[in-house]
């Protein structure tokens, strides 16, 4: 075994965190976050070490530095503010520090002779540092070295030696010749909407009056409604020309009538492909007007669906037949998921010989819509395309546009969903739709927020989608919709609904044991009465207003579940890490019956005095209560209130602190 290149680098650096797969992938944060890093750092013997956190942006050549604080058991911590979008690199640096070691030793000495000798040693260390310094700093250090040797009583010189000003000066001049360095890791900083967003999905073609194909101008007219509900992302299914060959009819009939409009996901016709707009929706200027009006007038970002698949009459099929697989009879292989067949859709062959050109063309689809002002993309079925493609295309696009957000619509196996998030997808759909009991929800959320997944996987909860009408909604009626809304909006900082189907309680399946909607908008135009008395619009607006007003609900990292003696009740809390509000949720999971129980809260964790009452204000239901101690009673009737969203207030001093005063 050969000698090490640097045998005098004695500090061991281990377990730098956070990190994903030994640094293969970056962790994720949002702009404005304070990024905290920890590391194990230690050396042989009893000498003192100095540990730094270094960070920089890709364009920077010099590292910024923060001194790490010892936590005990050789664990160190420091952090820095993430002030800009894009990538940051970070690493730890540590070395055995002679001055810190000497200073620590001096603090323990009591014998005068020992102290006098130690001060001489310290003076020589400071003099050596002065040789490396320049100008006024060098002169100041020589003066401090002389002061350690004499002229003042021993106690005064010892106090001077332990002065923090001297320590800081010595640390800035410390030799790093024998420093140990960790691997360099990365963190990608996304927009705040990556962490906290509220999505509303609608079909533009159903935004017009009954009997007429909707347009982008109709969607512009719908923006006040979407804003009133409190959404800040408006997601549109594909807006491209729809294929005519093998077009599906209403309710997914294999044969379409002349009046059938087809599925927006069967992209492409003689009128154009992925960079074209369906003529009935309007033109490019109409689309740009929608993007501009939504953002400038209502603070709503337009999210566009990207589905990399083609209808049989898509121009790509004619112009680039090599991008598709062909069957022995020469026909193009359509999409299949046996026993299901999708004759109206051709998937790309990512293993074709012309794959570099295919990749570049698909990248250009994103670039086209970015040029039209789109910054958020919902990507359809990314798990059916190669992982290397997504890592490349998202990396290329975000290098130029770090503000981009990509939502992965991959309802697939957990490891596949996690890999897509590691590769660059900003948010992901989840299994929330199929988690309905208290145990299912708590177990799933603890996995999402309490494991390493939380470093890179941002969940986006959807109670419904155009493809998924869960049995819980089908059978539970209006209370079930309210329950799932409250759960999605409070468990996850990112959530969305497919409307107006959701707020208008659309719940009739196409057939028994199906999650498909009857008369689904995927295959036909629908006219919606937004003014219906039974609409959930007011509840939706209220829960979204609560989310905006309480930062605790804009993050997932503080989510905690709490004991309750009734399995039909789910109790959980979130708090603002910046010392702000504490919000407690109790939700009735039973859409049919009134449920009650005793919830038990961790008073120490909440910093509540067990002997002092505290107020709980129901932000959703409007009630105000005075609770005592850890155990308190709740009762919820799903016909009137799906759940409580309590703001907990302590430190009540006078009767005027109570809302009902």
Model regions: which residues?
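Generic recognition of short, well-ordered alpha-helical segments
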Residues: 214, 247, 388-392, 596-598
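Aromatic-lined carbohydrate-binding surfaces of glycoside hydrolases
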Residues: 238-250, 306-323
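Alpha-amylase-like alpha-glycosidases and glucanotransferases acting on alpha-linked glucans and related
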Residues: 261-292, 298-300, 310-538, 542, ...
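Residues immediately flanking
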Residues: 306, 410, 465, 589, ...
């Amino acid at each position: 075994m050969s000698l090490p290149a640097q045998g005098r680098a004695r500090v061991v650096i281990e377990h730098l965190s956070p990190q994903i797969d030994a640094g293969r992938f970056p962790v994720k944060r949002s702009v404005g976050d304070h990024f905290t890093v920890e590391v194990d750092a230690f050396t042989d013997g009893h000498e003192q070490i100095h540990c730094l956190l270094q960070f920089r942006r890709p364009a920077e050549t010099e590292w910024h530095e923060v001194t790490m604080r010892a936590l005990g058991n050789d664990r160190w911590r420091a952090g820095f503010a993430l002030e800009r979008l894009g990538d940051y690199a970070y690493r730890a640096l540590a070395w055995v520090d002679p001055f810190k070691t000497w200073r620590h030793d001096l603090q323990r000495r009591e014998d005068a002779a020992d102290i006098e000798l130690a001060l001489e040693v310290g003076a020589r260390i400071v003099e050596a540092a002065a040789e490396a310094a320049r100008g006024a700093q060098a002169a100041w250090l020589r003066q401090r070295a002389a002061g350690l040797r004499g002229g003042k009583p021993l106690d005064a010189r010892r106090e001077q030696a332990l002065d923090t000003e001297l320590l800081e000066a010595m640390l800035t001049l410390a030799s790093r010749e024998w420093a140990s360095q960790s691997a360099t890791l990365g963190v990608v900083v996304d927009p705040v909407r990556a962490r906290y967003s509220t999505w509303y999905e609608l079909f533009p073609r159903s935004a017009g009056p009954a009997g007429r194909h909707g347009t982008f101008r109709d969607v512009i007219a719908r923006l006040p409604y979407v804003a009133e509900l409190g959404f800040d992302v408006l997601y549109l299914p594909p807006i491209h020309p729809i294929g005519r060959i093998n077009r599906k009819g209403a309710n997914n009939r294999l044969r379409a009538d002349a009046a059938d409009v087809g599925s927006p996901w069967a992209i492409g016709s003689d009128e154009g492909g992925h960079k074209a707009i369906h003529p009935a929706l309007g033109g490019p200027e109409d689309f740009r007007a929608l993007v501009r009006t939504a953002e400038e007038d209502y603070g709503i970002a337009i999210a566009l669906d990207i589905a990399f698949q083609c209808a049989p009459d898509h121009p790509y099929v004619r112009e680039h037949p090599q991008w598709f697989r062909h069957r022995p009879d020469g026909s193009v292989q359509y999409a299949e998921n046996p026993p299901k067949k999708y004759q109206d859709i051709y998937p790309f062959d990512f293993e074709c010989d012309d794959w570099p050109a295919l990749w570049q063309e698909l990248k250009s689809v994103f670039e086209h819509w970015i040029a039209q002002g789109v910054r958020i993309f919902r990507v359809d079925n990314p798990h059916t395309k190669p992982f290397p493609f997504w890592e490349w295309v998202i990396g290329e696009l975000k290098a130029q546009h770090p503000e981009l957000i990509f939502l992965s619509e991959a309802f697939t196996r957990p490891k596949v969903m996690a890999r897509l998030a590691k590769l660059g997808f900003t948010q992901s759909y989840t299994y929330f739709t199929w988690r309905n009991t208290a145990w299912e929800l708590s177990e799933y959320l603890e996995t999402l927020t309490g494991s390493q997944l939380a470093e890179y996987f941002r969940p986006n909860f959807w109670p419904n989608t155009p493809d998924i009408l869960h049995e819980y909604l089908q059978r539970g009626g209006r209370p079930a919709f309210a329950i799932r809304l409250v759960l999605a909006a409070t468990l996850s900082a990112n959530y969305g609904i497919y409307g107006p189907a959701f707020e208008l309680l659309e719940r009739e399946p196409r057939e028994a044991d199906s999650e498909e909607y009857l008369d689904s908008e995927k295959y036909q135009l629908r006219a919606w009465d937004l003014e219906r008395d039974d609409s959930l619009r007011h509840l939706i607006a209220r829960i979204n207003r609560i989310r905006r007003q309480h930062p605790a609900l804009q993050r997932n990292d503080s989510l905690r579940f709490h004991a309750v003696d009734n399995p039909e009740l789910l109790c959980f809390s979130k708090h603002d890490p910046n010392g702000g509000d504490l919000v407690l949720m109790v939700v009735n999971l039973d859409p049919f019956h009134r449920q009650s129980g005793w919830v038990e809260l961790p008073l120490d964790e909440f910093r509540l005095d067990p002997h002092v009452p505290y107020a709980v204000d129901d932000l959703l239901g409007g009630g105000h209560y005075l609770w005592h101690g850890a155990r308190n009673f709740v009762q919820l009737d799903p016909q009137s209130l799906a759940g409580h969203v309590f703001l907990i207030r302590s430190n009540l001093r006078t009767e005027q602190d109570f809302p009902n005063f």
